[in-house]
Amino acid sequence: MNETTQSVWPYTSRLQKGGALLEDMRLLVRAWSHEPAEEILERVLRSNLLNKQTRARLADVYRRAFVPRFLKGPIPDAWTLVRPLEDAEAPLRLVRPVYYWLTALAEPLLGDFCREVLFAQANGVRGETGTEHVLAWFASKGCPWSQDVSKRVARGLLAALRDFGILEGKVRKRLAHTTPPLPSLAYIAFCLRLQGANSRELVLHKDWQLFHLSPDEVERAFLHAHQDRLLEYYAAGSVIQIQFPADSLEEYARVVTR
């Protein structure tokens, strides 16, 4: 089974090629625009923007990571969601959760593992995660890869979660137990609003499980964000109202980085 069958099979082996690739993705997002992709890619290749040893390696990162995550993923042209933060010179601690969120959406293998395995760990089921746990989960999902490929994908998945700050540790990984900065959560909520989520859906959205947050924890985060004037949060019984002090991503990026 190859990567072109993703419309039928949700999981790919792409993570074996580099995991998070966070710095590479940031460089490409900063270089991207609404010009034809072929023209931008050619400039990136000529300048060796990613400082790779060969053009083939740079092109591989573009094809296997940047395209599915930030050009042709579940959110088309997702680079436009995070670019305003880069233009506002947001610090790494603020942009990293947003890149993680978009990557987990584009790589269902990563997102589902976080929801189904790590979200349970956050509630006290198990404290550590190793390659064997990932491989067992792959087997439960019927992943069709060879043992060698499965091991490489498992290592790439764990490395990605470490680089995104979800896990910590070298060999035996454990949950970092750190909540993303409020500005990051507020910015993701604003992106979800632009994708059509209403106020109640923002609190209950399944994407918060990627950060091991229950609806109650999301509500508390929104209350703190309200106090920090990142958004306005009102709740009366089952009625929830969330409003943002901006109409565009560019405006809101300035709000969360002030």
PLM ranges: what are they?
Residues A136, A154-L157, T179-P180:
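Beta-rich nucleic-acid/ligand-interaction surfaces
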Residues R126-T129, S146-K151, L167-T179:
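Short acidic alpha-helical/loop segments enriched in Asp/Glu that coordinate divalent cations
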Residues Q53-D60, W145-D163, F211-H224:
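Short amphipathic alpha-helical interaction segments
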Residues E128-P144:
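DNA-recognition alpha helix
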Residues M1-L105, L109, F113-A120, T129:
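Eukaryotic partner-binding/assembly regions in large regulatory complexes
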Residues A122-R126, Q195:
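Short helix-capping/hinge SLiMs at alpha-helix to coil transitions
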Residues E168-E251:
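Accessory, usually C-terminal, subdomains that scaffold auxiliary metal cofactors
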Residues L110-R115, T131, A154, S184-A189:
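Short, leucine-enriched amphipathic alpha-helices that occur as contiguous helical runs
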